[in-house]
Regions:
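C-terminal accessory module of base-excision DNA glycosylases/AP lyases that mediates lesion recognition
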Residues: 1-31, 95, 118, 133-205
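Alpha-helical scaffolds flanking conserved acidic
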Residues: 8, 38-42, 78-79, 121-122, ...
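Short N-terminal amphipathic alpha-helix/helix-capping patch enriched in small hydrophobics
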Residues: 10, 17, 39-44, 60
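Alpha-helical ds-nucleic-acid-binding substructure associated with the helix-hairpin-helix region
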Residues: 20, 24, 52-53, 57-129, ...
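Hydrophobic (often cysteine-bearing) scaffold residues that line and stabilize catalytic clefts
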Residues: 36, 40, 44, 53-57, ...
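Amphipathic alpha-helical segments that form the core helices of the histone-fold
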Residues: 43-45, 84, 180
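Buried hydrophobic packing segments
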Residues: 44, 97-100, 161
């Protein structure tokens, strides 16, 4: 399981280099990120949440829980595609999470993830159907606790940066990268606090 032993040091680092983030950290002192180590769970939950609102994703997830008595790859593996679709998933998403569950069933995801570098995690996960850079970023943050992830594919993060740094004006990804550069090597922590500014209740993938 990932850990966040770096968290307090990270807060000091980003706060000393960015007065805007310093104020945000003070406004949202708790909770901090708590990586859970379950890569497969994050893959599945992230696929469910792709390109829909947090509220819609939560509703779909709750229907999946009700259908299967809990959401895990074993239960998904035993559930047919049309039943998954009945939870509110598109056909494509239902196929994606079924494929992930099948990989889990045959042991293809039985990996010592904590021993891998960030680049190695990306190399292993990106070839999976339905898994893109954003989904891998969620795994790196919420499952494995990597400290310097900047999920530029996350609409919420981009909106939070624009709200706090440009008065809501649209920014290019290059501009966001520039704003985020002083946060290195703790961009995960900065991302976590910026997310709080648009949703005080933490999302957990």
């Amino acid at each position: 399981m990932g850990n966040t032993d770096y968290w307090n040091e990270a807060i000091g680092h980003i706060s000393s280099r960015d007065p805007i983030l310093s104020r945000i950290v003070e406004a949202y002192p708790e909770p901090k990120l708590s990586p859970h180590g379950d890569v497969v769970r994050t893959l599945i939950k992230s696929v469910v949440g792709q390109q829909i609102s947090v509220q819609a994703a939560d509703a779909t997830w709750e229907r999946m829980v009700a259908l299967m008595g809990g959401v895990d790859p074993g239960r998904i593996y035993e559930t047919d595609i049309m039943s998954l679709r009945g939870c509110g998933l598109s056909m494509r998403k239902a196929e994606y999470i079924s494929g992930i569950a099948e990989m889990w069933e045959r042991g293809a995801l039985n990996v010592n993830w904590d021993e891998l570098e960030e680049s190695e995690v990306r190399e292993r996960l990106l070839p999976i159907r339905g898994v893109g850079p954003w989904t891998v970023d969620m795994v790196l943050i919420f499952s494995l606790g990597f400290q310097d992830v900047l999920p530029l594919g996350d609409v919420g993060l981009l909106r939070a940066v624009e709200n706090n740094y440009s008065g809501g004006k649209k920014l290019t990804l290059e501009e966001v990268r520039g704003i985020a550069d002083p946060w290195r090597p703790y961009r995960t922590v900065a991302t976590w606090y910026l997310w709080r500014t648009i949703d005080a209740e933490p999302v957990n993938y």
